[in-house]
Regions:
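N-terminal small-residue-enriched
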Residues: 1-183
């Protein structure tokens, strides 16, 4: 596989990828994908996802919709709204009952690991989806206050010292299931 997993490091990540050594293989894979037969079946099928596809799916389908500024419509004209409205908190069946998705700003070597967010809130770990149910949001100080909370869960991010912090996705991962569960 030529894809590099995201890491919180510098250009040494690119240098170690051996891009030139993978040119032929990557080109062959691209041609193979272009000529792959289209799925024409009806109904259910088995789909095997690479980890890079799974983390992108979680990022887009759970991360962005649970950014509380998006839920409140702050980004409606730019990036859309969310199905995870506040009246659905602790009620919305977001996934199958055995699914747990954890936000964790303390995860070692995570892309969004920090000691404090960009509003000075200490890094935390919390369930966004617990047993398949919407359990919490990604908040900054403003959205946490609007939700009636005394503090944020530390999801504020600014891309520079001169930018206003916004709610952004922390390290968001699928938690392993219980031993013996096979779904």
């Amino acid at each position: 596989n030529y894809e590099r997993p995201p890491l919180n490091i510098g250009y040494e990540h690119i240098d170690s990828a051996d891009l030139l050594g993978n040119i032929e293989r990557v080109a062959e894979e691209a041609i193979e994908k272009v000529h792959a037969p289209e799925f024409t079946g009806d109904g259910k099928t088995t789909l095997i996802l690479k980890p890079s596809n799974l983390f992108l799916t979680i990022h887009e389908s759970v991360g962005h919709p649970t950014e509380l500024d998006r839920v409140y419509g702050y980004e409606a004209n730019f990036a859309g709204t969310s199905l995870a409205t506040t009246d659905n908190l602790h009620q919305l069946q977001y996934a199958s009952p055995w699914i747990n998705l954890v936000a964790d700003r303390t995860q070692p070597q995570g892309r969004s690991t920090v000691a404090y967010d960009d509003e000075g809130v200490p890094a935390q770990r919390w369930y966004v989806v617990k047993d398949g149910i919407l359990n919490d949001y990604l908040t900054d100080r403003e959205t946490a206050f609007r939700l009636g909370r005394g503090s944020s869960n530390g999801s504020a991010f600014a891309d520079s010292w001169s930018s206003t912090p916004m709610v952004r996705i922390p390290n968001l991962g699928l938690e392993p299931g219980k031993p013996g569960d096979s779904h």
